[in-house]
């Protein structure tokens, strides 16, 4: 999504993913043996996610107490982008009328990176559920690939300065 939308006015660049959780649709994270530990070991930086409890570590406490996989995929997608140097933080997950299907929405800076982060987050969570770990080579590759997307889509220094000045003055802009 680009521009103000149903999900947010303040965060105009959003990935909207329709996620069918299949076998884990009715399981909360506390019902998956070893999932919390595997997630916290794989992405220890998730400790910085506040989530609804409103404090550092809030998201991981939700995972420990039990939250649904769509919510976890949202946070993992955001964290993978953060590890690649992209300042993102907005996300929402909502159940649809179709059982086991969720709408997962999260912010991106670079659209290709956002799409990649969505796929990588699903892959990472699925691996933790089925094997209890995420291969270290994959964990190194994902942020590296995301950083490449970020760098490929980055503005040059002079254009960046013009864009920041326009934003300060609340002048709209569009990437052409």
Pin down the residues of each PLM region.
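Preference for protein termini
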Residues: 1-175
